[in-house]
């Protein structure tokens, strides 16, 4: 009898314990879900309010149209004026350099004109700032032949001053200093006609 009573009490206690346990689990689960939803709702409302305030703060303070356009246009004009100044100065420098090179080319081409009124040679038509045209020396049958150079003055300089320059002649791998009263070399076609074999 006593054993049956104890077994019956144990089963009743276990049943009551299991029912109470599951009821507590269900209650705690629902309470935790409710608390989580409440906390999440509060956080969501705070975030949305802060984002709306930031967005409205960046958009709402608008200046009048006339006052907002004036500083922009003045700064834009100032930047354009600066860029225009630099462009003008660079264009002036380039134009000055191109004019100087054109005058040098005209002087050299007019100084070395062809007496036969033919097309000037490549050396006479282009400007070589660091080249001084020595007279053309041609060896024919082991004899040194130099073409004469005329003393032409530049048309831009209105005086007849002859600037004597030493002329160099090459013969048998040796450098010789010659007189300065020789003419510039003629055009390439006349040289070929003068020396057809070479």
Curated annotation (Swiss-Prot):
Record carries keyword Nucleus: yes
Keyword Kinase in record: no
Chain residue ranges for the region called Disordered: 58-83, 172-198
Pfam families registered for this protein in UniProt: Myc_target_1
Biased composition, class Polar residues, residue ranges: 172-181
One GO term describing the cellular component: nucleus
Residue ranges annotated as motif Bipartite nuclear localization signal: 52-72
Subcellular location: Nucleus
Keyword annotations of the record: Nucleus
Superkingdom to which the source organism belongs: Eukaryota
Coiled-coil region: none
Sequence similarity: Belongs to the MYCT1 family.
Known role: May regulate certain MYC target genes, MYC seems to be a direct upstream transcriptional activator.
Protein name as catalogued: Myc target protein 1 homolog
């Amino acid at each position: 009898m006593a054993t049956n009573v104890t077994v019956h009490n144990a089963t009743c206690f276990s049943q009551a314990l299991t029912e109470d346990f599951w009821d507590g689990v269900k209650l705690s689960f629902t309470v935790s879900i409710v608390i989580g939803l409440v906390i999440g709702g509060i956080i969501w409302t705070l975030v949305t309010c802060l984002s709306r305030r930031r967005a409205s703060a960046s958009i709402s303070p608008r200046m009048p149209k006339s006052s907002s356009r004036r500083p922009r246009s003045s700064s834009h004009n100032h930047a354009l004026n600066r860029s225009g100044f630099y462009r003008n100065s660079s264009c002036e420098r380039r134009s000055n350099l191109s004019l100087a090179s054109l005058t040098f080319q005209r002087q050299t081409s007019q100084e070395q004109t062809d007496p036969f009124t033919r097309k000037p040679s490549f050396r006479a038509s282009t400007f070589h700032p660091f080249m001084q045209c020595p007279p053309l020396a041609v060896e024919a049958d082991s004899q040194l032949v130099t073409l004469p150079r005329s003393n032409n003055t530049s048309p831009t300089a209105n005086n007849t001053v002859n600037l004597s320059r030493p002329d160099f002649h090459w013969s048998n791998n040796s450098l010789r200093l010659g007189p300065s009263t020789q003419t510039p070399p003629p055009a390439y076609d006349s040289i070929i006609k003068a020396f057809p074999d070479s």
